[in-house]
């Protein structure tokens, strides 16, 4: 038998692409002429994947970068405009909103506006890194190592001379 194995994230990627299409339309219709619009960027769904029975990924637009998931992932009993969702890295607060043809989504803002990004490569790399951090368990060896302070203090004289030679953690 030939062919490839089914991609478990195919539905997630498709949903992310559909959401990106809605944001492209919003960008052209309502955002392009606003001062928060970064012309160097486009709209892209980054890293969309299956997660705990739902979909999660990062939406990059010329005016924001958000972690997003379908609002159906939020318990129906939840009322109000926000919800806390558990990720391996910890609980994250999301805002519930409506997006065009997609309907209700839950989003968590990472950046807005987006002027600190010179191009899509920089924005995409940041989105990928943010999603990786979100999926890293807070008590994992890697997460603990990243939180540890430097093993030696910085020598002030060398710092002021611009000759730091100490090994940092």
UniProtKB/Swiss-Prot annotation:
Pfam family, one: NiFe-hyd_HybE
Secretion signal, residue range per the UniProt entry: none
Entry-linked InterPro entries: NiFe-hyd_HybE (IPR023994), NiFe-hyd_HybE_sf (IPR038530)
Protein family (similarity comment): Belongs to the HupJ family.
Protein name: Hydrogenase expression/formation protein HupJ
Protein source organism: Bradyrhizobium diazoefficiens (strain JCM 10833 / BCRC 13528 / IAM 13628 / NBRC 14792 / USDA 110)
């Amino acid at each position: 038998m030939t062919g490839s194995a089914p991609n478990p994230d195919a539905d997630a990627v498709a949903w992310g692409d559909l959401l990106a299409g809605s944001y492209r339309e919003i960008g052209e219709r309502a955002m392009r002429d606003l001062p928060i619009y970064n012309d160097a960027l486009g709209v892209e769904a980054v890293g969309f994947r299956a997660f705990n029975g739902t979909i999660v990924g990062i939406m990059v637009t010329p005016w924001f970068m958000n972690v997003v998931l379908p609002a159906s992932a939020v318990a129906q009993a939840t009322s109000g405009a926000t919800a806390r969702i558990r990720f391996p890295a910890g609980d994250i607060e999301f805002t519930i909103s409506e997006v065009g043809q997609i309907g209700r989504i839950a989003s968590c803002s990472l950046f807005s506006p987006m002027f600190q990004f010179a191009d899509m490569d920089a924005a995409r790399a940041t989105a990928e890194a943010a999603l990786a951090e979100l999926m890293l368990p807070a008590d994992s060896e890697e997460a603990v190592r990243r939180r540890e302070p430097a093993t030696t203090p910085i020598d002030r004289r060398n710092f002021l001379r611009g000759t730091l030679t100490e090994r940092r953690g």
